[in-house]
UniProtKB/Swiss-Prot annotation:
The keyword RNA-binding applies. InterPro entries: DRBM-containing_protein, dsRBD_dom, STAU2_DSRM_2, Staufen_C. This is Double-stranded RNA-binding protein Staufen homolog. Keywords: Cell projection, Repeat, RNA-binding. It comes from Aplysia californica (California sea hare). Residues 25-168, 202-274, 288-342, 758-833, 922-950 are annotated as: Disordered. GO terms for molecular function: double-stranded RNA binding; mRNA binding. PROSITE patterns: DS_RBD.
Length: 950
C-alpha cells in the first residue's frame, strides 16, 4: 500500500511538470492494476466464463503483464540502490539554483529540470517508463546547495548508466516481441479454425437430422401405401375367384393341390418364409420393416384384416411380390396388351385350344372406312364355335374376338399351373418373376459371352458294395448279432449266422448341369433338371455381377472355338429345323450344291410379290410369296419333297441324332391372311373402302395387272379447272372428271367398279369438292337467299338459251350465244361459232352509247339486265346514282354517279362492258373456238371512252 501510494504521488507531481510523459506511465499502471486484480480474484471469473466459441486471450495478457512487471522491478532496484548509496554517504547534497535563472535546463536524457527559489522539482524520464524524483523534494530542500548539487550529479550519472542498459534491452526486446507475436498469431489462427469447424458442425447437424427425418417419413408413407395396395389386390383376387368357381373345383379335385399350393392366384409366387412363419398371419395389422440397399421389405398381411378374405391356413398363404405393386388398377392391366404380367386374351385362347386339343383360326371378314381410320372385322373360329368382333386395327379386333370367346365358350378352361417348389425357390432374386436363367441371359448378352447349358449324367453306383459299408462309406448301417441257436431265428444250423441288415429307402436321383459363360464353367445340381439349371445360373450370377462389363471387346479365338464345339455337340431335332436347313443338310450328305435365286419381282413398292427358284443338282423348284423369305421357304419345301423321293444312302456321312418325340410345328402367327385373297375378290367385301384402293385390291386378288390412270385433259380457268382422268384395266377404260386430279381419279375408279360388276356405291367424302349447278360454291343450296332479277329488255325465251349437259357445267370465260345448232355434239357446247363472234363485233360499235351497247350484248347473250336509278339532293345540286345488275344465278352489280341520268347510266354500263371484254380475252385457241379480235375490242373501248367524254 505504501508503495502504491508513493507511486500515485509521483504521478501527480510529474503530471504537473510533463503531462505527456505521465501518459505512458499511467497506461502501464492501469495494466499493472488490472493484472493485480486478476491475480487476486479476477482470474477465476475470467476462466469461468470461457466457452468453446470464445477466444482464449489470457496468454497474451499474461505475457504483457510479465514484461511490464520486469520493467517495474528494474526501476525499483535502481531506486533501492540509490537509497543505499545515500545512507552510506550522508554528506551528499543537492544542487541549488538561483531563482533568477527561471525556465528549465535540459538534461542528457532529454528531460527538463524546473527550478524555483523555494523548491526544486526534478523529473527524469526513461524510455519505457518515467521515474519521478519528486518524492526527494522534501528531503533535499533543507540541505545545503552544495550537497544538493553533488547528489544531482551523482544521480545524473546513474541515470545515464540506466539509460544505456535500457537501450541494450530495447534492442533485444523487438526480436523477442516478434517471436512471441508470431506464436500468439499462430495460436489465434488455430483457435479461429477450430471455432469455424465447430460452428459448421453445429449448422450441419440440424440439416442432417431434418433430412433423415424426411427420409424416414417418406419410407413410412411408401410402405403404408404399398400395404394398402396389396390388400386391395388380395381382395380383387378373391372376388375374381368367387366369380369363376370352375377353376376352384378343378383345383379341389387335382391330386397336387395340397403340395403345390395351387390355391394361390395366378401370377403370385409362394415364399418358403410364409410356410415356416404362418403363425404371423394372425396379427391384427401388417408388420412393415424398412429394408435398404434395394431389398424387399418383408410384409405379412393378415386374412382377418379384410372382411371378404378367405379363411386359409398358413400353408395356403400367398406372398405378394414387389413387382405387382405397379398393377394396382386391375382394369388398366386388362386393357394394356403389352403387359407381360397378365396374359392377353389371344394367349388364353391358345392355351384353351391346346388344352381341349382343337384348332382355332382368325379370319379377316371385312374392313371399312377411309384409309386413315379403318375399321376391321375379324371372325374367330374355335372348334365349332364362331365369334366376331371389330377394332381399329387387326390386332385389336383379334383380341376383342378372343375376349368374347373366353366369356361365351362352352369348352372347359385349363387349370392354372401350380407353383413350383424347388431349391431355386429358396434363393430367388429381388424380382420374384425373373428366374436366374433369364437374368443370367441378359447379363451374358451385355458382356457379349454366350451362356451354354449342358446336362451331366451322374455315374450310377455299382449294384454291390463293401461289407458293413453303406453307399456313403459309413460302418453303422448293419452289424452281426450272435445269439444262441435256440433264440436266434436266423440261425440255420451248421454254424452259419446270417447278419441283420437295415433296409433304407432308395436315394432320390440328382440332376447335374454344366454352365459355361465365356471361359468360366459352373456346375449346378438339383432335384430336377430345371432346378439344376437355376442353381448353376445363381452361382454364375454371384461371380459375374461383381465383374466389370466388357462391352465392345471381341471374343478370343479360344472362346470362339469352344462355342463352336459346344454348338456341334448339341443335338437338334429335325422337327425344330427349318426347311432351308434340312435341304442344305440333305444336299451336304449327297455332295450336292444348293442355290437359291430370286428370278422375278412384281407389284408396287409397298406390296411386292417375289418368285424364288431353288436348284439342287438337276432338280428345280419355284416358290412365290410376298417376301423373299417366304418365297425361299416355299421353294425349299417343294425341294425337300423332291429330295425325300431319292433312294437312301448306303453309308450316311455322319450318324443321325437321336430321335425325339415329334412336336407339332409352330403355326404361322399370321393366320389372318389365309383366305384374304379370296375374300377381297368378293363383291360384298370392303364396301366403305376408297374406290381407288378397292379396285387395286380386286386386281391383286385376281392376280391381274394393277389399274393404270392417265390424265387426258384439263380445261377451264386457273382457279376453276376441270380435269379428266381415264383408268385402264386390261382392255377396259373408263373416264372420270372432277375439279382436281384426286376426285377425277376417284370418279374414274367408281365407274370402273360399276363396269366390273361391283355396283354398291361407295360413300362420298364428307367435304366434297364437286360443285353442283343446283347448289352454291360449298355444296349448299341457296335457299331463301336466291334472288331472281327480271329484265324487261331480255327476251327470257328458254328455247334460245344455251344449255349444258347434265354432268357438265358452263366454263367461265366463254360467251355462249343463242344458236340454232344448240343440239349439236357435246364437244361444241362450250365454244362459240364464227357467226356469233361476227355478230358480237357488229354489236360493239363506237357510235353507240355504252348503255345501248350493254343492252344489245345482254340481249345477244340471253342475260338478264336490271337498271336502278336513284336521285339524291345535295347543296351543290342534284346527283343521280345508277346501279346495273347482270345475271340471275351469280349476279354482278355495277355503279355510276353523275349530275345527269344518262351520264350516270353510261358510267355504270362502261364498267359492265369492261368485265365482259375481259372475259372475252381469256378465251384460248386450241379447240375451244376462234378468238375475239383485239382491234375490234380496242375500237369499241375507245369509242365508249369518247362517247362518255362527250
Amino acid at each position: 500500500m505504501s508503495h502504491n501510494h508513493m507511486m500515485n504521488n509521483q504521478q501527480q507531481h510529474a503530471a504537473m511538470i510533463n503531462p505527456g510523459a505521465v501518459a505512458s506511465v499511467s497506461g502501464a499502471q492501469v495494466q499493472q492494476r488490472s493484472m493485480m486484480s486478476q491475480q487476486r480474484g479476477g482470474s477465476h471469473a475470467i476462466n469461468s466464463s470461457k466457452s468453446p466459441y470464445q477466444l482464449q486471450t489470457s496468454s497474451i495478457s499474461q505475457f504483457s503483464h510479465l514484461q511490464q512487471q520486469q520493467q517495474q522491478q528494474q526501476q525499483q532496484q535502481l531506486v533501492n540502490n540509490y537509497h543505499k548509496q545515500k545512507q552510506m554517504s550522508p554528506d551528499i547534497t543537492s544542487h541549488q539554483f538561483s531563482s533568477s535563472t527561471g525556465g528549465g535546463m535540459p538534461t542528457q536524457n532529454g528531460n527538463y529540470q524546473s527550478m524555483s527559489g523555494s523548491s526544486i522539482h526534478t523529473s527524469m524520464g526513461l524510455d519505457n517508463g518515467q521515474l519521478s524524483l519528486q518524492h526527494q523534494h522534501h528531503q533535499y530542500s533543507s540541505q545545503p546547495a552544495q550537497a544538493l548539487q553533488t547528489s544531482v550529479q551523482q544521480h545524473h550519472y546513474q541515470s545515464q548508466q540506466m539509460t544505456q542498459q535500457q537501450q541494450q534491452a530495447a534492442q533485444q526486446q523487438p526480436q523477442q516481441q516478434y517471436q512471441s507475436f508470431q506464436q500468439q498469431h499462430h495460436l489465434i489462427q488455430q483457435q479461429q479454425q477450430q471455432q469455424q469447424i465447430h460452428t459448421q458442425q453445429q449448422q450441419q447437424l440440424p440439416q442432417q437430422a431434418m433430412h433423415q427425418q424426411q427420409q424416414h417419413l417418406q419410407l413410412h408413407q411408401h410402405l403404408q401405401q404399398r400395404s394398402l395396395n396389396q390388400q386391395q389386390q388380395q381382395q380383387q383376387r378373391y372376388q375374381k375367384q368367387q366369380q369363376q368357381p370352375q377353376p376352384k373345383q378343378i383345383l379341389q379335385h387335382s391330386p397336387t393341390s395340397g403340395k403345390s399350393l395351387s390355391s394361390a392366384p395366378h401370377g403370385t409366387s409362394v415364399q418358403p418364409s410364409t410356410l415356416l412363419n404362418h403363425h404371423q398371419h394372425n396379427m391384427a395389422a401388417p408388420q412393415v420393416t424398412p429394408v435398404t440397399n434395394g431389398e424387399s421389405a418383408g410384409e405379412d398381411t393378415s386374412p382377418k384384416d379384410s372382411p371378404q378374405a378367405p379363411k386359409t391356413s398358413g400353408r395356403d398363404s400367398v406372398h405378394v411380390s414387389d413387382n405387382e405393386e405397379s398393377a394396382s388398377n386391375a382394369s388398366e392391366m386388362q386393357q394394356s396388351l403389352a403387359n407381360t404380367k397378365e396374359k392377353t386374351p389371344m394367349c388364353l385362347i391358345n392355351e384353351l385350344a391346346r388344352f381341349n386339343k382343337m384348332s382355332h383360326q382368325y379370319t379377316l371378314v371385312d374392313e371399312q372406312g377411309p384409309a386413315h381410320k379403318k375399321t376391321f372385322y375379324v371372325k374367330l373360329k374355335l372348334g365349332d364355335e364362331e365369334y366376331s368382333a371389330s377394332g381399329e386395327s387387326i390386332k385389336k379386333a383379334q383380341h376383342a374376338a378372343a375376349a368374347i370367346a373366353l366369356v361365351e365358350t362352352k369348352c372347359p378352361h385349363p387349370p392354372p399351373k401350380p407353383a413350383r417348389l424347388g431349391c431355386c425357390d429358396l434363393e430367388k432374386s429381388a424380382d420374384g418373376n425373373i428366374t436366374p436363367t433369364v437374368e443370367l441371359n441378359a447379363l451374358a448378352m451385355k458382356r457379349g459371352e454366350p451362356a451354354l447349358y449342358k446336362s451331366i449324367e451322374p455315374q450310377q453306383p455299382p449294384y454291390y458294395h463293401q461289407p458293413n459299408m453303406d453307399f456313403r462309406g459309413l460302418y453303422n448301417q448293419r452289424y452281426h448279432q450272435y445269439m444262441r441257436a435256440s433264440r436266434d431265428p436266423r440261425y440255420r444250423g451248421n454254424g452259419v449266422l446270417w447278419p441283420l441288415r437295415y433296409h433304407y429307402p432308395r436315394m432320390n436321383r440328382a440332376f447335374y448341369v454344366s454352365l459355361r459363360v465365356g471361359h468360366r464353367e459352373f456346375i449346378g445340381d438339383g432335384p430336377t433338371r430345371q432346378a439344376a439349371r437355376h442353381n448353376a445360373a445363381q452361382k454364375a450370377l454371384r461371380i459375374l455381377k461383381n465383374l466389370p462389363v466388357q462391352s465392345g471387346e471381341k471374343k478370343s479365338e479360344e472362346q470362339a472355338d469352344e462355342a463352336a464345339e459346344d454348338a456341334c455337340e448339341e443335338d437338334v431335332d429335325d422337327s425344330l429345323k427349318s426347311e432351308i436347313s434340312l435341304v442344305h443338310e440333305i444336299a451336304l450328305r449327297r455332295n450336292m450344291v444348293v442355290q437359291f435365286e430370286v428370278i422375278r419381282e412384281t407389284g408396287p413398292p409397298h406390296m411386292k410379290n417375289f418368285l424364288t427358284r431353288c436348284t439342287v443338282a438337276d432338280m428345280v423348284t419355284e416358290g412365290e410369296g410376298n417376301s423373299k423369305k417366304t418365297s425361299k421357304k416355299k421353294a425349299a419345301e417343294l425341294m425337300l419333297e423332291e429330295l425325300r423321293k431319292l433312294p437312301p444312302l448306303a453309308t450316311p456321312a455322319f450318324p443321325r441324332p437321336k430321335s425325339k418325340i415329334q412336336m407339332n410345328k409352330k403355326k404361322n402367327r399370321n393366320l389372318i391372311k389365309s383366305e384374304l385373297q379370296q375374300q377381297k375378290a368378293d363383291p360384298n367385301y370392303g364396301v366403305g373402302i376408297n374406290p381407288i384402293s378397292r379396285l387395286i385390291q380386286i386386281m391383286q386378288a385376281q392376280k391381274k395387272k394393277e389399274p393404270v390412270y392417265t390424265l387426258v385433259t384439263e380445261r377451264g380457268l386457273p382457279r376453276r379447272r376441270e380435269f379428266i382422268v381415264q383408268v385402264e384395266v386390261e382392255d377396259k377404260t373408263c373416264p372420270g372428271s372432277g375439279p382436281n386430279k384426286k376426285l377425277a381419279k376417284r370418279a374414274a375408279a367408281e365407274a370402273m367398279l360399276q363396269l366390273l360388276g361391283y355396283t354398291k356405291p361407295s360413300p362420298q367424302p364428307t367435304k366434297s369438292s364437286f360443285k353442283n349447278p343446283s347448289t352454291g360454291e360449298a355444296g349448299q343450296t341457296n335457299g331463301d337467299k336466291k334472288v331472281t332479277f327480271v329484265g324487261g329488255d331480255s327476251p327470257g325465251d328458254g328455247d334460245d338459251k344455251v344449255s349444258s349437259g347434265s354432268n357438265q357445267q358452263r366454263v367461265p370465260g366463254l360467251l355462249h350465244l343463242p344458236s340454232k345448232s344448240s343440239a349439236s355434239s357435246s364437244g361444241n357446247q362450250h365454244t362459240a361459232s364464227k357467226e356469233s363472234l361476227v355478230n358480237l363485233a357488229s354489236i360493239l360499235k363506237p357510235n353507240l352509247r355504252p348503255e345501248i351497247q350493254l343492252r344489245e350484248l345482254c340481249k345477244a347473250m340471253d342475260c338478264q339486265l336490271e337498271i336502278d336509278d336513284f336521285t339524291k339532293k345535295r347543296t351543290s345540286g342534284t346527283e343521280h346514282i345508277t346501279r346495273i345488275t347482270i345475271g340471275s344465278e351469280n349476279p354482278q352489280s355495277f355503279h355510276g354517279s353523275n349530275t345527269s341520268l344518262e351520264s350516270s347510266r353510261d358510267m355504270a354500263a362502261l364498267d359492265a362492258l369492261k368485265v365482259l371484254v375481259a372475259r372475252a380475252k381469256d378465251i384460248h385457241p386450241g379447240g375451244d373456238g376462234p378468238q375475239v379480235k383485239k382491234d375490234v375490242l380496242a375500237r369499241s373501248g375507245s369509242g365508249m371512252k369518247k362517247d362518255f367524254s362527250k
